Amino acid sequence: MERSPIEAVLFDNDGTLVDSEAISNEVMVTTLGRHGIELGLEEAVTRWSGVDLHLMLRVLQEESGVTLPGDFLDEFRAGQLAELEARVEAMPGAAEALRRLELPRAVVSNAPVTKIALCLRTAELMEFIDERHLYSAYDVGKWKPDPASYLHAARSMGVAPERCAVVEDSVSGATCLDAADAVLDHRGELPDWPDVERLEALTDLLDRLD
């Protein structure tokens, strides 16, 4: 990587380490539908992937004219966690990449730490991650694309942000990284960004870090 030496790797979780996004989207679509807001699965992916959940719900309420109950997020989270615990799996290559990675690593997500940990345990990835290095946007009160959660993770690990490789899969995650002065490597069909390397599989990261 051009911005070497890299001293730590910060991974996004949903869609990067664990195949959780389709499950979460299904639960969100169903839960919104119970309260009169129609959201298609395709729109959930193309419009809202990686976006702050609070922002998404605020916009959907404004557009639909429907006011969601105060405990909506609790209802959604309960259904989401139950489905994830039953169904979530690791992304292809995630276990191998984490097993072979020789650098310190952390997981940084917009989701609560409880959800991050549940997904990693269910997908049998927690053995490769120190649970002290699970970082949530809820820790800092700012959500991607704001870089605050990545900066918080880097500081907590004692590593300068510019010496962290950041692995993301969403436009939202990519957008925040210039401000964080971190390197982004991502998987999936995303636009091209300067200084961003595209990964076809997580194991490709190991070659880039050599």
What are these regions (language model features)?
Residues 29-32, 52-66, 119:
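Helix-loop "lid/cap" segments that line or gate small-molecule binding pockets
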Residues 1-7, 103, 112-210:
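Asp-based, Mg2+/Mn2+-dependent phosphohydrolase catalytic module
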Residues 23, 48-52, 76, 89-93, ...:
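Short beta->alpha linker loops
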Residues 34-38, 64-68, 124-128, 158-159:
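Short helix-capping segments at alpha-helix termini
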Residues 38, 58-96:
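Metal-dependent phosphoesterase signature
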Residues 5, 82-107, 113, 117, ...:
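Short, acidic loop-to-helix structural element flanking the phosphoryl-transfer center
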Residues 1-45, 63:
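Active-site neighborhood of HAD-like aspartate-dependent phosphohydrolases
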